[in-house]
Amino acid sequence: MNFLSDFQAGLGIALQFDNLLYCFAGVALGTVIGMLPGIGALSTISMLLPLTFYMEPTGAIIMLAGIFYGAQYGGSTASILMNIPGTATNAVTCLDGYPMAKNGRAGVALGMTTIVSFIGGSFSILLLMFLAPLIADVAISFQAPEYFAVILFGLVAASTMASGSVVKGLAMVTVGIVLGLVGLDLNTGVPRFQFGFVEMSDGLSIVALAMGLFGVAEILYNLMNTDGSPFKVQDVTMRSLMPTRQDVKTATAPTIRGMIIGAACGILPGTGATIASFLSYATEKRLSRHPEKFGTGIIEGIAAPEAANNASVQSAFIPTLSLGIPGDAVMAVMLGALMIHGIAPGPALVTQQPELFWGLIMSFWIGNLFLLLLNLPLIGLFVRILKIPYDALYIAMLVFICLGVYSIRNNVFDIFVVVFFGIVGVAMILGRYPAAPLLLGFLLGPMLEENMRRALLVSRGDFSIFVHG
């Protein structure tokens, strides 16, 4: 009965006009952003964080989440039509999506990716509905030592499973933890790592850090590697989007396997949608009777990875909401957004603020339905967005970032922080240092320190409490 009452309350919140508007705006913007190679959901969410300060918390989180999973839908469009992934998670879709487009089946490829994305996302929303409350019920009894262990596991997993060197991942986590300790020690009042800057007394801004590392860095890197001209793309009509009965039959099993793989990867910290899509593609190729056909434009090659990456995106909310442990960089920014709005993520969110939790889940259902309705009839309109000159788009985004970060505290120092971390972010991209573990370390580092201090206070300095509890 409690489940039904929470379900009804959440549906009522999600169906409020303001929240419907925020949900629609989020998924529509996410779709557009996903189509534009090099921008991505992470930088967009980072840029829009200042805007959400003036919004009601539930609506703000609904909109930001809509951008995240909406970008997965849009990312496949660029992969199929231009052989350029709109987001990293859609990279594997290029392998068979673009050959399908060259074979005259671009419409079928786009239609199929939209349908399987909806199925994969819906599957993970069901998991979120049932698993997150169960995990939260267990985690509500956690004390400081258990929280320390869970946070430490999340940091280590994120660093070791990140793309590239494990050593680089661990190094970035360490740097993130150190950056998270900047400012006054809350227990002693002693300033730490301020280097004489009074503006750093309250610590570094999560918005400035995220905007610099993921917004400015990506824009600068893309400006360095493109000429700013718009892409040449095929036109797509509504009639060409419908797959045949044989296409649906062929794609059914790969879609089921893909959404299961994606949901599992989303729950595990550090894996995420990119690994899920590649793993599902590799699985289908291994199980296929004709593996040599992969890469030539077959429906299985797009159905499995698209179902996987959308399932992964939705299931990534399970550890973030129920434990307060983000699995990737986007979830870390979402965690920061919750904190900015005074919402403590973790088991208390699920058990003590069920209206927010269930309202968010119900908005996922509505958002997925919006995406299905948007991406099928309006795909021809969305494709035209790819013809926007990139140099003008990027310059406008840089101005928006600076105005946004300044508006938070009316402090010019934050703009310098954004610029500094933007340059650092470009250097990290060139050196292949993953930025996501750094952001995770920045967010979770203070939580790790606080729970370690509490545990040692209870045990009177005995470190064995972390082993025996």
Give the residues covered by each predicted segment.
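Helix-loop-helix hairpins and the membrane-proximal interhelical loops
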Residues: 1-60, 133, 191-298, 383, ...
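N-terminal alpha-helical transmembrane segments of multi-pass membrane transport
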Residues: 1-62, 103-112, 117, 121-132, ...
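Short helix-coil transition sites and intra-membrane helix breaks within transmembrane domains
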Residues: 33-42, 80-91, 123-127, 265-274, ...
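Re-entrant/interfacial helical elements at transmembrane boundaries that shape
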Residues: 41-51, 64, 79-99, 130, ...
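Membrane-interface alpha-helices at helix entry/exit sites of multi-pass transporters
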Residues: 58-62, 99-116, 288-302, 322-325, ...
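A structural-propensity feature for long, helix-poor, extended segments
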Residues: 68-80, 86, 298-323, 327, ...
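Membrane-embedded alpha-helical modules
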Residues: 111-227, 340-468
